[in-house]
Amino acid sequence: MKSLFLIAFTSIALSQSPVPAGAQLEKLATGFQQPEGPVWKDGAGLLFSDIARSTIYLWSPVDSSTSVYLHPSDSSNGLTFDRQGRLILTQMLKRRVSRQVIDGSITPLVSTYNGKQFNCPNDVVVRSDGSIFFTDPDFNIPAGQQSQLHFQGIYRLSPTGTLQLLDSTFDKPNGICFSPDEKKLYVNDSHKCIIYVWDVINDSTLANKTVLYTIPAMGYADGMKTDEDGTIYCTGPTGVWILSPSGVYLDKIAMPETPSNCNWGDADRRTLYITAGSSIYRIRMTTTGVRTSGFRKSGFYELRENYPDPCDPGTMIKFHLPTECDVPLCVFDGIGREVTTLVSGTLPTGDYSRHWDTSEVSSGVYFYRLSTGSYVIARKLIVLK
């Protein structure tokens, strides 16, 4: 059952705070052991890890249900998507970073540095060029196993599979995220509650490491995200700490359970989803979050999620094309039969919307699919009458 909590502001009413006045923190689900790594899957809902149960769950915004998405997940922690929409996950039990391919199987991407096994890859982010950045602290190394590395690193895995050590000076590197323009990288040193920032040079090199902010509370910093304004959201002691791009404290979302991570969700990316304690929460914000699906720049194809209005006999399906191409956009019913073709022809670069009149179909689950040669993606759509 969902619960609502009034947010108690911990600062004076700062005008820069992205938390709206009177905002309510909503508990969506509870009873998990170690929820982590939330990420929004367009057309489906919120994916999140339960490390202790070695399971990835899916929370659905349609009926607020929670179902098993992947089990066993080898104690997955951080989750994100690459630019092809494939799930990227850190697997603590296997001490590696992996990818889930279209058929649902798991493909290991990297598990060693210079022939030595990683400590325990924790959090992960994908840059819009396809490179994967991740942290590798030594907590949660599986029982009976030892650390083979004498440092705890921050790494970059290039789109061609080349692994690069970016930093080896942290005590416990944990949360990791980019600024909206990807010119800054943020990583926190978890047990010290220090957030650092670098300049990203030539897409792959870090420079000018600087302390951005030190959380003034006992505990540890965990997962982090940014919004479109560059504001940083760091889960940590007693709540989600909100900082300006220059490291000025703006506000804190006070939490009834200790938060472990957060991410943006819903079609407009204006809801912050938070894993905390044994539960999942959300809160609506005044700002829009940075997508974690590899589509942050306009150079990629995108088929956007859709939530039909039951009071409207039609619905809009939106998509983006980075280049001119032949585009079939079709709708299928739940057993794969084609219902209608919305687009069939060549379109130039740009953003598009196509209307589908649902008055002639019954309530149920449908799928809309965009095909552009090598790029094919489908989204689920639910018609309610």
Q: Language-model features: where?
A:
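Sec-dependent N-terminal signal peptides
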Residues: 3-12
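A short helix->beta-strand "capping" segment at the edge of beta-propeller domains
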Residues: 16-32, 209
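Beta-rich, blade/repeat-based domains predominating
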Residues: 24, 30-45, 72-91, 95-96, ...
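Beta-propeller domains
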Residues: 46-67
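A detector of repeated loop/turn-to-beta-strand junctions in beta-rich toroidal repeat architectures
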Residues: 53, 94, 148-152, 192, ...
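A short loop-to-beta-strand structural motif that recurs across blades of beta-propeller domains
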Residues: 55-57, 96-98, 152-155, 194-196, ...
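Short loop/turn segments that connect beta-strands within beta-propeller blades
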Residues: 60-64, 101-105, 158-161, 200-204, ...
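C-terminal outer-membrane/trafficking sorting elements
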Residues: 296-385
